[in-house]
């Protein structure tokens, strides 16, 4: 299978919410570059959509062994996949996804584009917000390789952005210390902090900015 054929299968899977066998299980070993090339074609095949941001996945090193990955990934978010709720409450129709899961998020909006070809750019923030992402696996039982995940668009389903907050000079440090608890039916399922996100959410943005320079055909932030 070539990149076009793989992208067609992925886009059909997403459109129909129908899972497929991971490409890595079929002996199709993609390089990181090839996987991002597939994801770009997938985005085109899913139809015209304004890209409004990037999601960063697998930023928590503590789960890398669970999913057998060894680095974060990213994928585009479109105007149709992002919703806003100042009340911090939002109902999502899960029938549009294959095997959805929920992840609490720190959402950041950049005031300006960071310098592209540098390891430690200044990150200028416009606002921050709590949010949650519905991540989705087109591969059964969430079993896939790193490049399988990249090819599917970084496992992005949808993002809900909560109430926006102003930023200050202390925001980067404060986000490292912020705590979050995830409940289901009133029962605590998981706890974490901003430090789980590649040592801090703004550190994750710097990682993304660097990563985009290392992969061909990627648009800067």
Task: Put a short name on every predicted segment.
Residues 215-220:
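Beta-rich strand-turn-strand
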Residues 2-206, 210, 214:
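Catalytic-core "active-site belt" of small-molecule-metabolizing enzymes
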């Amino acid at each position: 299978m070539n990149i076009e054929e793989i992208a067609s299968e992925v886009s059909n899977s997403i459109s129909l919410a129908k899972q497929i066998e991971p490409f890595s299980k079929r002996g199709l070993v993609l390089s990181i570059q090839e996987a991002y090339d597939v994801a770009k074609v997938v985005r085109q095949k899913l139809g015209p959509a304004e890209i409004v941001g990037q999601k960063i996945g697998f930023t928590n090193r503590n789960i890398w062994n669970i999913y057998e990955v060894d680095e974060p990934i990213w994928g585009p978010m479109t105007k149709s996949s992002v919703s806003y709720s100042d009340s911090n409450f939002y109902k999502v129709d899960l029938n549009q996804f294959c095997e959805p899961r929920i992840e609490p998020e720190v959402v950041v909006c950049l005031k300006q584009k960071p310098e592209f070809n540098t390891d430690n750019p200044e990150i200028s923030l416009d606002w921050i917000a709590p949010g949650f992402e519905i991540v989705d696996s087109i591969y059964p039982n969430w079993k896939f390789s790193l490049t399988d995940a990249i090819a599917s668009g970084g496992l992005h389903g949808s993002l809900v952005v909560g109430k926006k907050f102003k930023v200050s000079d202390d925001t980067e440090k404060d986000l490292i210390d912020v705590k979050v608890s995830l409940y289901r039916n009133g029962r605590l399922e998981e706890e974490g902090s901003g430090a789980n996100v590649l040592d801090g959410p703004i550190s994750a943005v710097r990682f993304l900015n660097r990563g985009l320079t290392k992969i061909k055909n990627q648009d800067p932030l």
